[in-house]
Amino acid sequence: MFAKLLKYEWRSSRKTIATLCAVILISGLLIGSGAFAMVRWDSLTDGSEVLGTIVILLMSVCMMAVAVSCAASVFYVLWRFYKSRFTEEGYLTYTLPVNNHFLILSSLLMSALEILLVLLAAGVAVALALGIFSLCLPWKEIGPDAWNAIARALGELGNELGKHGKDILLLLMTAILAGISTLIMLMLSVTVGAIVAKKHPILMAVVVFYGIGILRSVLNVVGLITGGEEAVYSALTMMNISSLVTIGAGYALIYWLTGKKLNLT
């Protein structure tokens, strides 16, 4: 039943997520093409300032479209969570033959997946733009000595990264936990706003989110100040601990609020 619930969540949002990804990819294509045109065709800049201005404006709009689409993915998954839990659709959701844990986990997993898909699309768009722009670079003018120097520099970079493998893993773990905890904070804020302050749910959600964020920031600063020579590691450790606490406590509060306040248990 949990798999069916995930499938239902995906079917409800796949068109919107696909649209956001398409907007991002098309924007990346246009940004790369615009950069290619600006470098390759002098007529767009020297010969016709109007066309050059249009190309620059188009590239700026596309960059804004990428940023807005990434932000929209977060707002969309929160809106979907609110709609499927705290509206008329939500009452139908809670009549499904699954427990509250499955309902929360399905929303959490699908929200994370949908945001991740949009972010991956943004990464592909950046690679696409850089790839198109690289076509106008004078690769043939780069001599073998320059390529050898680049290869040596990359080799040295790889060696340095290998020496700091544990640090890289720590940073990666910090980023993953921070992303999950932020999503939990957002879902908790929506839950509190919808249940505690029905007249002003958005305002309450904003207050709760920033309240938790400020508390976590204070704890992270304390870890940085008291860390001494290992201040960076101490701060990262404190961030990971606060993220884990946020994930556990936030999930428990969401479960309790949706279960007890809506008389599900």
Task: Kindly label every feature range from the protein language model.
Residues 1-90, 100-265:
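Hydrophobic alpha-helical transmembrane segments of membrane proteins
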